[in-house]
Amino acid sequence: SMRPKEIRELGDPELDQKEKDLREETFRLRLRMAAGQTENKMAGRAARRDLARVLTIKAERKASSEG
C-alpha cells in the first residue's frame, strides 16, 4: 500500500501508469474473489485504496492547474 506522499512524488506519466496497473490489479483480484480462488481480501482492499489515492491526487492536480 502506497502512502499519499509517495504518490504525490510521482510525475504525471507515472501516475497514469500506476492508475492503469491498479485498475488491472483490482479487476484481477475481483475475478479471483468471484471464483473463490483467493482468501486474501485485504489485498483487494489495499489495491482499491491505492487506486482511490491515485485518482484523488490526479483530481487535485487537475483542479490546481485549472484554477
Predicted regions and their residues:
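Extended, charge-rich alpha-helical interface modules
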Residues: 1-67
